[in-house]
Amino acid sequence: MHGILPLWKPKGLTSHDCVMRCRRYFKTKKVGHTGTLDPEVEGVLPICIGQATKIVPFLTDTKKVYEATVQLGYSTETEDATGKIVETKEVSDFPTNKNLEEVLQTFIGRTKQIPPMYSAVKVNGKKLYEYARANESVERPVREIEIFELTLTSVDEKNHSFDIRIVCSKGTYIRTLCVDIGKALGYPAHMSLLTRTKTGAFSEKNTVTFDMIEEAVSNQSEERLLEPIINGLQHLEQIEVNEDMEKRILNGQKLSLQRNQPKQTDPFVFVREGNVLAIYQSHPTNEDQIKPVRVFAIEDKKV
């Protein structure tokens, strides 16, 4: 059984909890998620089953879409609503919609972000939240992220909050973004609510819940919930090959580029009759060759 489960992660579960449940439901240890969501966050969490686990890093690398609420007036140690309040300031002059939109525009593009102390980012083999809980200070790594879209969706002036929609690269901490937006507006702030509505090609409307999975398991139809692996690689270039080339690709052979053949965008996918065969990329030392990164065994023509 191979494929991608477009899970809607509920609040209260860690991403690892979701993986463990899916291992039980699908009776396999080959299960992996494609981007951590905090326990208090709900949203799209594609789960890779069987051979689909080979594409986890490629699916993790896709754009993410979030909806978040920025709460002005106080900040917390965790940068979300679960942490202890560390700074407060009366919101005496709530920003106008125009001011909010102007500030949001300044965050669009490539930028650098320092991850929050209460996060799973590792420094010297230890997670940042472990340092935070032990009250130890450590230099946090600066990471490059990209905000593709950042829009204002609604305003609640009475409660000093507003909602935003974010399209961003992997590794973006929305909590930190909310704090930085607050600073730009002149107020301490935190993220009071977050939902991930899309990861790569998987959106909220296509997801399944644990209740749906349990019902499918009881009917022995859980495999129907899985999307084919190719659906998780829609962001990569796909090249259709013939039967002879299929055999060479499935054997994991390095391939020569034909004369005058344009180079593909790295990485790219070889497919045959709708099935993903392998993911290839340019050879690091031979510009006239391409090499396999992942090869998929075609057992039942459902990958």
From Swiss-Prot:
GO terms for molecular function: RNA binding; tRNA pseudouridine(55) synthase activity. The active site is at D38 (nucleophile). GO terms for biological process: mRNA pseudouridine synthesis; tRNA pseudouridine synthesis. Keywords: Isomerase, tRNA processing. The keyword tRNA processing applies. Pfam families: TruB_C_2, TruB_N. SUPFAM superfamilies: Pseudouridine synthase. Its EC number is 5.4.99.25. It catalyses: uridine(55) in tRNA = pseudouridine(55) in tRNA. Responsible for synthesis of pseudouridine from uracil-55 in the psi GC loop of transfer RNAs. Belongs to the pseudouridine synthase TruB family. Type 1 subfamily. HAMAP family: TruB_bact. This is tRNA pseudouridine synthase B. It comes from Oceanobacillus iheyensis (strain DSM 14371 / CIP 107618 / JCM 11309 / KCTC 3954 / HTE831).
